[in-house]
Curated annotation (Swiss-Prot):
The keyword Transmembrane helix does not apply. It comes from Arabidopsis thaliana (Mouse-ear cress). May be processed at its C-terminus. This is 1-aminocyclopropane-1-carboxylate synthase 9. It catalyses: S-adenosyl-L-methionine = 1-aminocyclopropane-1-carboxylate + S-methyl-5'-thioadenosine + H(+). Pfam families: Aminotran_1_2 (PF00155). The gene is ACS9.
Length: 470
């Protein structure tokens, strides 16, 4: 062990939380309708599998893109050789336009300010390297994505200080919570370099409100720190709401070309909106030239392959396809989310009202034996091992209130979701029955004790009396 680095031998990787342990249990016993119908159903994976048919149809109609051809001629050799680390110009242009389309074309993105990365994990870590020294801190509102404990801290040496949010207001960010987190960092002698938020929120499945976004911009302005807005779920907003980006707020405040705008950075990827996590396509957007320059150099450690860029530049440049895809994706997500909510309600379980994402923030506080995180983990173990559902406990997301869970709904078929809800309902009903029996037994024992005490008091009082009083 002495021959290995401290980074290797320490447990600072952040992957020993229940979030990752649930995945491990699933992988040991994965559900399969035919091969393993009693296996664990994966509801802890935020994966969008609802619109593969649309992409596959497009690929069938555009064989050149899928076959690495141009005008029918192979360009395999051209793509196989070294390319500019900055990325293919046509892909960065198509990606910028796709990001604009998701935001209703209210804001613009300059392709020259985009840095490509191998997914948002790589993009977020790269920004940490650019903005923070080891030991510096970023403030994150809770609950937050459990992977950030690994992505932001492990290799960079940066620290996370939580902004504690409460269910009393739907876990929205408040000015007092921001100030308290900042003051806590100071007490810990940590230099705060910025705030990082996910918008839409992972794990809440809600967009940040304009009030929250304005508050964040005002806060980082007053403290002279950075704001990272991870917007990888921006294309998953469903319902009547439109996604509101931090870029919208900068425009509303006339800060688009200001010094403040240089401290606002966006992370994006195609993993959630297009359902392509295996393609490893992420991006950083920054108005700071030094950040763009440094991040571009760092991107050599996590490039996006030229073949992937070529295929996706053709896909994203097809405006008819992207328009149809975004509309249909949002419709299907809304239908699937409603199906999950209905299934939960049938089991007597509610969740935070959501309008985005691939998951719901589910309230199971009433199923806890006690209002503790120990009880939450016990419930989680029962759901994983007995009910055979892998869901993510709120404690893994640093939620301050026991009993909340993130439950994903877009990575499975409707039939599998129905089965998952059936299993959960049966578990809740059996738990309720046991509680009724337990309460009935408790009441009988309590009543028996009362009668026993009453009889004892009567006997004592009778024997204490003198003969004439009996």
């Amino acid at each position: 062990m002495k021959q290995l680095s401290r980074k290797v031998t320490s447990n600072a990787h952040g992957q020993d939380s229940s979030y990752f342990l649930g995945w491990e249990e699933y992988e040991k016993n994965p559900y399969d309708e035919i091969k393993n119908p009693n296996g664990i159903i994966q509801m802890g994976l935020a994966e969008n599998q609802l619109c593969f048919d649309l992409i596959e149809t497009w690929l069938a109609k555009n064989p050149d893109a899928a076959g690495l051809k141009k005008d029918g001629q192979s360009i395999f050799k051209e793509l196989a050789l070294f390319q500019d680390y900055h990325g293919l110009p046509e892909f960065k242009k198509a990606l910028a336009e796709f990001m604009e389309e998701i935001r209703g074309n209210r804001v613009t993105f300059d392709p020259s300010k985009i840095v490509l990365a191998a997914g948002s994990t790589s993009a977020n870590e790269t920004l940490m390297f650019c903005l923070a020294e080891p030991g510096d801190a970023f403030l994150l509102p809770t609950p937050y994505y459990p992977g950030f404990d690994r992505d932001l801290k492990w290799r960079t040496g940066a620290e996370i200080v939580p902004i504690h949010c409460s269910s009393s207001n739907g876990f929205q960010i408040t000015e007092s919570a921001l100030q308290q987190a900042y003051q806590q960092a100071q007490k810990l002698d940590l230099k705060v370099k910025g705030v990082l938020v996910t918008n839409p929120s992972n794990p809440l499945g809600t967009m940040l409100t304009r009030r929250e976004l304005n508050l964040l911009v005002d806060f980082i302005t007053s403290k002279n720190i950075h704001l990272i807005s991870d917007e990888i779920y921006s294309g998953t907003v469903f319902g009547f709401e439109q996604f509101v980006s931090v870029m919208d707020v900068l425009k509303d405040k006339n800060l688009e070309n200001s010094e403040v705008s240089k401290r606002v950075h966006i992370v994006y990827s195609l993993s959630k909106d297009l359902g392509l996590p295996g393609f490893r396509v992420g991006a950083i957007y920054s108005n700071d030239e030094m950040v763009v320059s440094a991040a571009t150099k760092m991107s050599s450690f996590g490039l996006v392959s030229s073949q992937t860029q070529y295929l996706l530049s053709a896909l994203l440049s097809d405006k008819k396809f992207t328009s149809t895809y975004l509309d249909e994706n949002q419709k299907r997500l809304k239908i699937r989310q409603k199906k999950l909510v209905s299934g939960l309600e049938a089991a007597g379980i509610t969740c935070l009202k959501s309008n985005a994402g691939l998951f719901c923030w589910v309230d199971m506080r009433h199923l806890l034996d006690t209002n503790t995180f120990e009880a939450e983990l016990e419930l989680w173990k029962k759901i994983v091992y007995d009910v055979k559902l892998n869901i993510s406990p709120g404690s893994s997301c640093h939620c301050t209130e026991p009993g909340w869970f993130r439950v994903c709904f877009a990575n499975m078929s409707e039939d599998t979701l129905d089965l998952a809800m059936k299993r959960l309902k049966e578990y809740v009903e059996s738990t309720d029955s046991r509680r009724v029996i337990s309460k009935s037994s408790h009441d009988r024992i309590k009543s028996l004790r009362k009668r026993t005490v009453s009889n004892w008091v009567f006997r004592v009082s009778w024997t204490d009396r003198v003969p004439d009083e009996r």
